[in-house]
Curated annotation (Swiss-Prot):
Entry EC number(s): 3.5.1.108
Function: Catalyzes the hydrolysis of UDP-3-O-myristoyl-N-acetylglucosamine to form UDP-3-O-myristoylglucosamine and acetate, the committed step in lipid A biosynthesis.
Keywords: Hydrolase, Lipid A biosynthesis, Lipid biosynthesis, Lipid metabolism, Metal-binding, Zinc
Annotated protein name in UniProt: UDP-3-O-acyl-N-acetylglucosamine deacetylase
Organism domain of life: Bacteria
Listed cofactors: Zn(2+)
Entry keyword Acyltransferase: no
Any one biological process term the GO annotation gives: lipid A biosynthetic process
Lineage: Bacteria, Pseudomonadati, Pseudomonadota, Gammaproteobacteria, Alteromonadales
InterPro entries according to UniProt: Ribosomal_Su5_D2-typ_SF, UDP-acyl_GlcNac_deAcase, UDP-acyl_GlcNac_deAcase_C, UDP-acyl_N-AcGlcN_deAcase_N
Active site (catalytic residues): H265 (proton donor)
Reactions accelerated catalytically: a UDP-3-O-[(3R)-3-hydroxyacyl]-N-acetyl-alpha-D-glucosamine + H2O = a UDP-3-O-[(3R)-3-hydroxyacyl]-alpha-D-glucosamine + acetate
Amino acid sequence: MIKQRTIKQSVQETGIGLHKGDKVTMTLRPAPANTGIVFRRVDLEPHADIPARAEAVGDTMLCTCITNADGVSISTVEHLASALAGLGIDNIIVEVDSDELPIMDGSASPFIFLLQSVGIEELNAPKQFIKIKKAIKVKDGDKWAELRPHDGFRVDFRIDFDHPAISQTRQHMVLDFDSSSYVDEVSRARTFGFMKDLEYMNANNLALGGSMANAVALDEYRVLNPEGLRYSDEFLKHKILDAIGDLYLGGHSIIGELVAYKTGHGLNNKLLNALLQNQACWEFVSYDNSEELPIRFASPILAN
């Protein structure tokens, strides 16, 4: 059978929180089968667990924030969730001593590195996938996102930014994860932002940790980062990275196709909730062997 996954051992990293700009220590710990993804606030006494659940997503203005039944929240979870989705990790405890995860370099790549550095372990329990049986779509003005049946996981994604530096890059792509590697194609794409917005947010005590060390910064005309872009279509690929993370807060990899136009955290979550609340549109499936499995994950990796 295709088995659930966790990590082989714990690993710790320190970084800056995007919103407060404070130092955050994060520890990733292995978890037993059927635990799911659980965020643990160790800065609180007693410690507070916040399970990743679609219905737990609250504020999505600048990032994805999830809240438990007691009202305890954790923010900026989408890049780690995206890395976990890309590596097919089902079970993990994420301890943080803050109300937000470290932003790292603004992509999923540092999380991929941490997870791979300790190795991925298979657990003796079947991995369950959410298989799309019937299309479901959500809209917000001219923005929309849809999940459709597909034997695999494919993303058909379009953005539309009227900005000189973005409009000259690719704004539409179809990525099939049967053949495309998440780690190579998507994980290194950084979040991006406009300097005028950052200045406004800083004045309102928001995004205090935001800098060119963890984002692609744009003025009215161009990219300001001296090193330029990591991918020629980094803006588009970061939006795909976000969507993969947002959809993984349902706790399971999706067998289906995401087709989206100008979607963001709020609409991604609206789509996931609409799906999970409409049982006619999906079912849980598991697979006996890798030949049947229509998604390609990295093989379980041994830590050095």
